[in-house]
Amino acid sequence: MSFVEELGARIEAADSVVSVGLDPDMERLPEDVQDAELPRWAFNRRIIDATHEHAAVFKPNAAFYEDSDGWRALRETVAYAHGKGVPVLLDAKRADIGNTARQYAEILAHVDAITVNPYLGEDALQPFLTQDEAGVFVLCRTSNEGGMDFQHLELAAYDRRLYEHVAERAAEWNAQYGDVGLVVGATAPDELQAIRERVPELPFLVPGVGAQGGDAEAAVEYGLNDDGVGLVNSTRGVIFAGEHGSAWAAAAGDAARTLRERLNRHR
């Protein structure tokens, strides 16, 4: 089964397009997990228990795991999420040349999909694109304000903006390799709509709906492809919803359920 097929099946089973980000910031972890052998894993396990019924995917960000204990925590997290029947999309924004890209792509033996950076071109992405049954989400129009610095540049040779060109190339890669999607932020709803009109077949990962205040209605209307496959991510708005209370895991579950219901009203 391809990743997009797997994701579509999960979306149908959970009646959800919610991506729950798993970014266990050590400075914000609750006191009752801080003394665990692997605090990030202890935190993630409680979050997964509380939210998995509402999640189409879990999305750990690699930056929160890049030390020896962190990688152990990530391995446990991925295995546990899979045990709950939920795919894992690693937000790593990888790309490099030659052997380095091939090494980065090895992670797809353990997770179901990954985010990549298109700046180095197709050859830097081929090790990811050629992985069987693995999803590849290409950064296109990101949710941060600084994304305008480069993504909005006009390409005179193509009569389009850079982010539009990325979308077109991603559609070509999808036609050749399959299982390619785009990362398009909910904080730029006009661009989100424009990109969807260019590439109706691609699934989008749409961040920025939670703490960043993005447009949830636009995220659903334009984030899903013709088959209703796509993801709307919230991280801090879910996992730290109960940050200042003892029932923090239950608060995360409530936040994920509320987001699912909110998004489903627009599906």
UniProtKB/Swiss-Prot annotation:
It comes from Halobacterium salinarum (strain ATCC 700922 / JCM 11081 / NRC-1) (Halobacterium halobium). The active site is at residue 93. Keywords: Decarboxylase, Lyase, Pyrimidine biosynthesis. It is an enzyme of class 4 (lyase). Its EC number is 4.1.1.23. Belongs to the OMP decarboxylase family. Type 2 subfamily. The gene is pyrF. SMART domains: OMPdecase. One of its GO terms (biological process) is 'de novo' UMP biosynthetic process. The keyword Lyase applies. It catalyses: orotidine 5'-phosphate + H(+) = UMP + CO2. GO terms for molecular function: orotidine-5'-phosphate decarboxylase activity. InterPro entries: Aldolase_TIM, OMPdecase_AS, OMPdecase_type-2, OMPdeCOase_dom, RibuloseP-bd_barrel. HAMAP family: OMPdecase_type2. This is Orotidine 5'-phosphate decarboxylase. Pathway: Pyrimidine metabolism; UMP biosynthesis via de novo pathway; UMP from orotate: step 2/2. The keyword Metal-binding does not apply.
